[in-house]
Amino acid sequence: MLYQNITNNSCINQALELYHKYCYDKTTYPDQIHTITKALQLDSSSFTAVLLHENIQHLNLEDYNHFNNNIIYLVDVINKLSTIHYKPYAEQYIHFHELLLTINPKLQETAILTSLVPLLHKVSIFNLEYNNTNAQHISEIITNCYIPYLLSYTAHNDLAYLLQDLCFKIQYPEERNRILHYMYWLYPDIDNIIHNIEQQFGNIFRKLNIKASLSYRIKSPYSIWIKTLVKDIHITALNDILAFRAIVPNKKACYDVSKLIHLHYNTITSQFVDYIRYPKNNGYQSIHLVISGGNKGNIELQIRSTTMHRQTQYGSAHHTYKVNKYYVSRTNNNVSVVLFNITLSYSNRILSVYVSIVTITSTINNNLYTDYNTIPSFTQYTQHSTNFVDNDITTCTLSRTTTPEYITYYNNNLSLLIKDTNTIPYNFFLNINLNLSNTVEYKLVPLAVVQIPASNLLFEHNSVFINITYKPILAECAFPATITYTKRHEDSNIRSIFKLFEHNSVFINITYKPILAECAFPATITYTKRHEDSNIRSIFKPPSPTYNTLLATINDKVVLEQYGQKEFLSTTINTNITQMLPIITLLVDPSELNKRINDISDSNKDQLLRLGLQLGCVESVPLLITHGANPNATNCHGVISLHCAAKNGNLDLAKLLAKNGADVNAKTDNGETVLHYAVKSGNLHLVKWLIENQANIHAKTDNGETVLHYAVSFNNSDLVYLLIAYGADVNAKTDNGLTALHYAVYDGNLDLVSLLISHGADVNAKTNSGETILYSAVDYGSPDLVYLLIAYGADVNAKTDNGETVLHYAVESGNLDLVSLLIHNGANVNNAKTILHFAAKSGNLNLVNWLIKNKADIHAKTNSGETILHFAAESGNLNLVNWLIKNKADIHAKTNSGETILHFAAKSGNLNLVNWLIKNKADIHAKTNSGETILHFAAKSGNLNLVNWLIKNKADIHAKTNSGETILHFAAESGNLNLVSLLIHNGTDINTKTDDGLTALHYAVESGNLNLVSLLIHKGIDVNAKTNSGETILHFAVDLGSLDLVSLLMVRGADVNAKTDDGLTALHYAVESDNLALVSLLMVYGADVNAKNNSGETPLHYAVIFNSLDLVSLLIHNGADINTKNNSGETVLNSIMEFNNCNILKSFILGGADINLETMLPDDQTDSIINLCGDLRIS
């Protein structure tokens, strides 16, 4: 039984005794509870509390005397929270939060997680009965109460997501099955997909010579379900079910990786988003692109730097992203998802409220999973915003992220109906009223539902027939509608409509903004119940004409095409519209701007100038320049107005700005000049004019790209020819050593390649890692490009910095056409690490056969002595190995380090290959020069079947390497629980030590696998075994910083005060690592706070040396001797004076340190103590 592993704890023993005394279930419950508590990373106190609560009705006061206050308190909390079960669904949430207020804040997190344990047991987390009514009820409690709580803790987000999907599985099994069905269809061999992408990215990282990491995640069925509803899309339209994230060193590497991804994969251009150049409003930065899956599932990729990743995970980007919340409700077969977002910001006496509410309703068909083409129909509506100015509203703060259902502004009063999952009951809103008299009124109001049938309304407005379909959901709240209309006359002037009318005794406001004729578009309908004493007839004020005109300008097709960043622009405008509207509207109306130009500050003129150029409001530009707008003023990215004009390709505005002093060579923060922007616009005349007006044609960006690089990357041959004609350096290199010819080859553009070479581009130019242009052509996979470059003199035998030729690349790609082309043009097939080695490693028998027929040496060796057969064995391809041996390859060949063919086969983990080699006389007992056997290599591979087979075939399970490592050491180091179990079952000696004195338990602790450590201890390994330097298992666990491992070792009898040969205890280690939690835990288990090392230094000396006030205070509080001396006669105060830490010194003196100890300090240091602590009266 699992729980029996920790029964050395007296509290647990007593709890188990009481449990068996009063409960019928003698075995399964404690076992399951122990598993759940460990999964939630709870300690023995929680396990004990749950056991006690199970028979709480039988306990008396005497029974409680055996347990400490923490355990008794946890039992009480579990008992209180269990009352939620008996509350109606609508009252569960408010009752849960009322109880939260009664829990000690310091213990609240542990108490909530502990109370979750019996709930998870009741829904039978390991054997769910999804149709069980009790399981449904408990999953509702978890969803309603626990998940919102866990989401408020970043550390528990993963647990919350796991529970979300678990409850989804219980509450909506048909929907989950449907989603899983689609997932299997979209990604039928997901493991292979992941493996291939990881391999490809490894190649990309190596080519760029960068240290990077790649991780992936598979979206949970619950997340997929929510997203399909919120985004109004079918599951097959999702791009991020499988998503990868590449973390690279810097911003430059992000773009380098992105370029290679576009070359290697078929990416979806419309899904490429550059959040690095154009960050989200919360500061989020990353490159997003989508790899096409053809007729199967697409794959999303995020590329970000280490700094960007930290900001996303832990900075403001993470915090703001988590503002979004949603709720799901279900009635019969109708599911409604309501998504809320609110931002409240207070500055300069303005409270800005930005609200986004989307409600989606869908009808569930339980048989949807049988029809891939079924796409549910949804409706939704868009954003609203308002702001107001008050006299003094600083006392009104909303400390939590809030989600308003409904917002009104009437007679200088702002009213918000707030639904805050952390503070407000499920079926109530918080009504907040704010007004100019600085009063704030809070009132809980019930969520009322009005039964209004879905309606169709038809009326005529501005010569347009309007047909409205709406379905109200909540009373006193906005709800969505879909409006369809047909244009009657060509000259109809369609404006935004704001209509108030009465329907079914409800006053209804409609706001909609038509964009295109003859189509459906979203509308917002708001309504309020009619009250006889109510003077409010309009919930939302009509949008102002200037706002509508601005939106029309933004949505103008020509403007958007010129700007080229619709999504970025829309986000920017929507976010800042409430604060910038008074200024932005001036751009739309130059006559109004002229009236108010003298009232606008210079900084606002500069801002208006850039914004006007971005939005295409060109009429305002001359007026702003005439009245002093600075054309060289920059925004936060270093962009000046001339950059904006160049990006839009506007030659006339560029001339006007330059005439008024704009710097034609101005650079942005990433080093892009105006000429770079002009090249991106593709305007040949603008580029020519800039060059003729002193724009630097040789200017480089921060990563070394010239304007020629840009022109080539945009495949603009006219611009390339123009730039060359004006003297652009065709051989200029980026910081990575890439020329424009590299770029042309990357894009596969034969015409540009020919153009550049004919104008002097070096066909053998190398990157910083030694790759020539020919390498890029092989990477692109085009025989035509390769042939063209060879015809122009490309060196087919040029080597990279690591000694590889282009033929290696071609062989690695498996492209026989390219290999043949290169060899027939003189590529050498027999280098040190031959082409044949590469072909064998890829497992490509046809390619190996072809190369040998073309005089590749089958007996060739690498510099480290590896033969072709070694590489073939590592590939795991039995047919290839068999073919090579039949063609006289040596089965007994060894590398310089003594590794045989069989070692390489074991490394691959291929049991069939290993079996075949041994049958063909390969030596099963062969050792490398370091003493590693075939079994050692098999243990490294982690292949359980292979290890088991080797043992059964007489491989020596007790074999040691030259340093004394057994197979068990290797298995423990890898953290492989099943492999260790297998070895123990087959009789390995678990207490065997290496030459340095390390046991398998030392290795297991370093692996961090708690279950593996527990298994070894259970099987009798010495928990207090020491290395040759005296380090115990506990020292290793403390050094690793694992509270769980330390707790387990202490429970299983580890000596907390054991010392190393230097006299260091585990407490010394914990203090040195500045780990407050570990120090506390060790002292709980009896660590000697005054233990001295061989130099006479206690843990307190260490705490002072490492300048940790918290540790000093904790040690003193637990009895550390503050006047103790080391072997040199120095007290801890000497160290304090050396580091001049006043706070620690005060702590010591208040704790009773003797500053008058004989010969303790010189007089000048004693005076320093008194000066540092002058505000303390020391007797």
Curated annotation (Swiss-Prot):
PROSITE patterns: ANK_REP_REGION, ANK_REPEAT. Gene3D superfamilies: Ankyrin repeat-containing domain (1.25.40.20), Beta Polymerase, domain 2 (3.30.460.10). The keyword Nucleotide-binding does not apply. ANK repeats lie at residues 282-311, 604-633, 637-666, 670-699, 703-732, 736-765, 769-798, 802-831, 833-860, 864-893, 897-926, 930-959, 963-992, 996-1025, 1029-1058, 1062-1091, 1095-1124, 1128-1157. It comes from the Bacteria. GO terms for biological process: guanosine tetraphosphate metabolic process. Keywords: ANK repeat, Repeat. InterPro entries: Ankyrin_rpt, Ankyrin_rpt-contain_sf, NT_sf, RelA_SpoT. Pfam families: Ank, Ank_2, Ank_4, RelA_SpoT. SUPFAM superfamilies: Ankyrin repeat, Nucleotidyltransferase. SMART domains: ANK, RelA_SpoT. This is Putative ankyrin repeat protein RF_0381. It comes from Rickettsia felis (strain ATCC VR-1525 / URRWXCal2).
